[in-house]
Amino acid sequence: MIDPKSGHVHTTFSQTVTATGRLASNNPNLQNIPIRTEAGRLIRSAFVAEPGCVLLSADYSQIELRLIADVANVKGLKDAFAKGLDIHAATASQVFGVPIENMDPMIRRNAKAINFGIIYGISPFGLARQLGITKTDAKKYIDSYMAQYPEIGRYMDDTIQFAKEHGYILTPFGRKCFISGFDNG
């Protein structure tokens, strides 16, 4: 795995092996090195910059929510991100009616599941199963979320309609992701 010329481990990055265009790494996969284990910390400590160089580490915190805020033009989410708010606590406050100052970690975790679940298309059944609640309660949470951020529902509906008409969707960078299972036209 160590290159004999450079003395370094080199990975191969590709954007063409995943349907979504998400960056993938192999030979070896350097994107999924554990951080919470002793072995993971030891592996990570081997990454050092050449003299006079620096390593850049980027944490795309809540990137999916930031992207949906942008592409769907969700003012409430954009404002929350601009103010540096904890978006999961803000969602919990709105969906569950709990003041942010009194946020229980379990309620925040449930809001996190709602935030990510909805943008990935979770159903009331799926959310109920994930949170251990009734399907009726899950539907109420989803409806409350969509009432708070109606732009997300419109964006999702428009995207589904586009996919039905064209057989693909476009990423924010113009990449076509072909979708099977829809009648084109």
Predicted features along the sequence, with ranges:
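Conserved catalytic core of nucleic-acid polymerases
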Residues: 10-11, 15-18, 93-185
